[in-house]
Each structure stands twice: as structure tokens, then as C-alpha cells.
Amino acid sequence: MALRPAKIDRYVDKPAYTRREYIRGAPGPKITIFDMGNPAGDFEFEVALHVSQPVQIRQNALEAARQQVNRYLQKNVGRSNYHFKIRVYPFQVLRENPMATGRKADRYGNGMRRPFGKPIGLAARLKKDQKVLSIRVNRQHLKFAIEGARRAAMKFPVKCYYRIYDKEGNDVTTKILSQGL
């Protein structure tokens, strides 16, 4: 079955559906690596990507963003000069009630009889202003981290923004951007 458009699953309008012991045939997570680069490194800044409204992000989008950002940072910064972390996990099980279409669909389709749906994928539920991912780097690589966050934001079905934090966790976005990169 083809992958449905992300706009169908992005809204947080239904209750959470995460109890896997009740779900037959729930798919496994596609994203398995959450820490990339140098996790033990000591870095000056953290560039974090936040979502601007409550949303569900499918695991396909998270994995696409992870691959894109990791490849970009490895190429431009080097493996030991950054720590990239995905901060959400896809717990939400997405369901679909497949509707029969075409000639004589009424003969074999169920319509709205038992319409609960079958599991088709997983998604991460995010609240407003929640961090999706973070990239820790030193000052000389800050522009690459910001570009990586921008590239990741393109993969998500919601408007995102980034913030720059220092080691203590203080928001220094305006200070850094006013000084220039």
C-alpha cells in the first residue's frame, strides 16, 4: 500500500494510541540510531530545532531528517566535531481503514463496518515549542549546524524554528546572530 500524504497524520486531534500489547501487527520503528557524531565531545553551543505548534511527525520524516543532517555534518564538519541527537521517539501507532474503490467495490468492501483500521506506521507526538533534534558544535562550525537544522525542518510537516544555547542552557540566539557567524 502506498504511503499516504503526511498532512493526513500531522494533526493531534485523536487520543494517543501507544499501547503495543493491545495492537496486533504494530510496525517496528524505522529509526534506530538517535545519537550521531561524537557524544562524548565537549562543545560550546547547541543548536536545537523546535516545532511551532502541536503536531505528529511520522517516523519516515524523522529518519529522512536524520540521514540528511548526519550526511551534511559529516561532510562539512567531520565526524568528531559535532554531536547530533534526535530528541523524540515515535510511540504513536497510526491506523488506516482501507476503503474499497472501483467497480463492484460494494460487493467486497466493508464500508464503515468495523472501521477501527489496521496499523500502518508510527509517529512522534510533539507539543508546542518542543525540541525535535539538537546539534552540539563549537563556534567555528555553528553555521553548518544552523544549516543542518534548516535542512531538517524541510522534512517536517510543520513550521519549525531553531534556537542556539550555550553550555549552561541559556538562549543566546540573538547575541550570536547579532555578532555574526
Swiss-Prot record:
Gene3D superfamilies, per database record: Ribosomal protein L10e/L16 (3.90.1170.10)
Molecular function as annotated in GO: structural constituent of ribosome
Keywords, alphabetical: Ribonucleoprotein, Ribosomal protein
InterPro entries: Ribosomal_uL16 (IPR047873), Ribosomal_uL16_arc (IPR022981), Ribosomal_uL16_CS_euk_arc (IPR018255), Ribosomal_uL16_dom (IPR016180), Ribosomal_uL16_euk_arch (IPR001197), Ribosomal_uL16_sf (IPR036920)
GO BP terms, alphabetized: translation
Pfam families: Ribosomal_L16 (PF00252)
GO cellular component: ribonucleoprotein complex; ribosome
Family classification: Belongs to the universal ribosomal protein uL16 family.
NCBIfam families tied to this protein: PRK04199.1-2, PRK04199.1-4
Protein name per its UniProtKB record: Large ribosomal subunit protein uL16
The species this protein was found in: Pyrococcus abyssi (strain GE5 / Orsay)
Phylogenetic lineage: Archaea, Methanobacteriati, Methanobacteriota, Thermococci, Thermococcales
